[in-house]
Each structure stands twice: as structure tokens, then as C-alpha cells.
A protein has these predicted regions:
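Short cysteine/histidine-rich metal-coordination sites, predominantly Zn2+-binding motifs
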Residues: 187-188, 208-217
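Glycine-rich nucleotide phosphate-binding loop and flanking beta-alpha elements
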Residues: 126, 205-206
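ATP-dependent adenylation/nucleotidyltransferase module used to activate substrates
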Residues: 1-175
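Local cysteine-cluster metal-coordination motifs and their immediate loop/turn environment
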Residues: 104, 182-203
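Short amphipathic alpha-helical interaction/hinge segments
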Residues: 149, 206-209
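Short, intrinsically disordered, charge-biased short linear motifs at domain edges
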Residues: 170-173, 178-187
């Protein structure tokens, strides 16, 4: 295996990280996927991530950190059913420092398998509301990883400069199976169609002019 083309993908099961995974494969990377159970209500995230990894022919490790629910309870509606979900962005949607947690684990994994790149699905539409989706965040974390491992590992969000709709267009051109991806904050058989993530998903497909294959309740 060529270590310079060996990468780790933080794969949530959503469309953004799935596009990144397909893009990395197209770039010739050997992709190794990580998905996380962090106490989220939407347990289908990791289920769909496993299906997507299988479709890609890539290995996946699902890391069970469900006990994080104990610190996210009362903080975020993604982990606590007693906090109402909203159809627009609101502070309780944010899972504090989530990407830092996931990317830190990804660094450890990358060291173990000799990967030199870590990719995750942050994009331009995220930057306004999510500090851990901004370039200054992941570049700072990259520097911390160098200091903490003495390994040259790059942390990148390849599509941080474009919108979610533009990202979906990239994915459509790559043949991403969007029907396998999961965005909803709930755990129903279908996307609820009403939570902020479902609303953003619908809007992005519409803006991109791509048929939305999602089944909504």
C-alpha cells in the first residue's frame, strides 16, 4: 500500500462526507473509513455509513463512544429527545467540539495505518454556524496533531470553499448513491423532512437542480 495515498475518511453516513469519500477514491486514495456512535438519536447514521463503505469497497471501523451521551444530555437536541428539534439552525443543534473529537480519533487511526491524509465533509455552508467546520479550526488541529505525534498528517476538508448545493453537484458527477445517505436528526424509517438537517438537504438538492432521491415521512 502506498502510504502517501492512504487516507482516513470521517464518514458520518451523510451526503457531505460521502461525497468526500467518493472524491478521495477518484483521486486514487486507499480510503479507510471511520464512523462514530456518540449517543446520537439518529442511529441510522452509522448503519448507512457501513452500507456506503461497502459500496465503495472500503474498510470501515465504527467507533462506539455512546457514553458521550452523558455529557451531551441537556446540551444538544441531537442526543437528547427532551430538547426540541427546530427546522432552522439553533444553538441546541450544535454538538460541542464534535469534529475535534472525531478528528482526534482519526489522527490516532491514521498513525496506526500509516495514512498521511484525513478528510472530512465540512463545506462552505457550514462555516457560519459551526466553528469546527472552518479552515482555521482544522489547520490548527492539524498542527496539534503534528506536535502530538511527530507525524506529518494533513487534516483537510476538500470542499470547504463551496456550498452544500455545489457539493451535491460534485457528488452527482462522481456517481454518489445519495439514496444511501442519511441526514435526519431522528431515527425513523424515513427522513422526517422537518428537522434543520432535512430542510437543508431538501434545499440543497433543489438549488443544485438534482432530483432528491430521499424518502421523507
Amino acid at each position: 500500500m502506498n502510504q502517501t495515498k492512504n487516507c482516513v475518511i470521517v464518514l458520518s453516513g451523510g451526503p457531505d462526507s460521502t461525497v468526500v469519500a467518493y472524491w478521495a477514491k477518484k483521486q486514487g486514495y486507499d480510503i479507510n473509513c471511520l464512523s462514530f456512535k456518540y449517543g446520537q438519536i439518529a442511529e441510522k447514521e452509522t448503519q448507512q455509513a457501513a452500507l456506503i463503505a461497502e459500496k465503495l469497497g472500503a474498510p470501515i471501523k465504527i467507533i462506539d463512544m455512546s457514553s458521550l451521551r452523558e455529557i451531551f444530555k441537556g446540551v444538544t437536541s441531537l442526543c437528547d429527545r427532551n430538547i426540541s428539534l427546530t427546522s432552522q439552525f439553533s444553538a441546541p443543534i450544535v454538538v460541542p467540539f464534535r469534529n475535534a473529537i472525531f478528528l482526534s480519533v482519526a489522527v490516532s487511526y491514521a498513525v496506526g495505518i500509516g495514512a498521511t491524509r484525513i478528510f472530512y465533509g465540512a463545506h462552505g455552508s457550514d462555516a457560519a454556524n459551526y466553528p469546527d467546520c472552518r479552515p482555521d479550526f482544522y489547520k490548527s488541529l492539524e498542527e496539534t496533531a503534528w506536535l502530538g505525534t511527530e507525524k506529518t498528517i494533513q487534516i483537510q476538508a476538500p470542499f470547504c470553499g463551496i456550498s452544500k448545493a455545489e457539493l451535491l453537484t460534485v457528488g452527482a458527477n462522481l456517481g454518489v448513491p445519495f439514496e444511501l445517505t442519511w441526514s435526519c436528526y431522528l431515527d425513523g424509517e424515513k427522513h422526517c423532512g422537518k428537522c434543520e438537517s432535512c430542510v437543508n438537504r431538501k434545499a440543497a438538492f433543489k438549488e443544485a437542480g438534482i432530483q432528491d432521491p430521499t424518502q421523507y415521512a
